[in-house]
């Protein structure tokens, strides 16, 4: 989507998330599908901002939905809803970012608690 002063790029990815020191009963890694919207100023290669909505289902079938926003250390992920073991983590935030960019639509990310 193009405007006079900028461009919006929408991208959907299939990723692997790893968790630093996950709580007991949680998996070290989960799969996530994210829809990202990146904002670029005209003529710039680096985005000026982004937001992403991510959906995840762990191996037990518990689900979560999270919102990713920019953070000085990479990205801030805030869980907006969850079921099963994830239900108690609604509103919790983690900080992390890309570890490996596998291709244009697949990456691995690692997350750690904000406190």
Task: Name the predicted role of every residue range.
Residues 1-115:
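Beta-strand-enriched cores of mature, soluble protein domains
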């Amino acid at each position: 989507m193009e405007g006079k002063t900028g461009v919006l790029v929408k991208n959907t990815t299939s990723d692997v998330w790893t968790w630093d020191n996950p709580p007991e009963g949680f998996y070290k890694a989960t799969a996530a599908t994210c829809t990202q919207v990146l904002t670029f100023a005209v003529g710039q290669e680096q985005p000026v901002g982004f937001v992403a909505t991510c959906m995840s289902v762990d191996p037990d079938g518990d689900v979560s939905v999270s919102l990713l926003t920019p953070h000085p250390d990479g990205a801030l992920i805030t869980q907006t809803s969850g079921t099963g073991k994830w239900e108690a983590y609604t509103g919790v935030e983690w900080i992390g970012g890309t570890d490996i960019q596998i291709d244009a639509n697949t990456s691995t990310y690692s997350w750690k608690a904000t406190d």
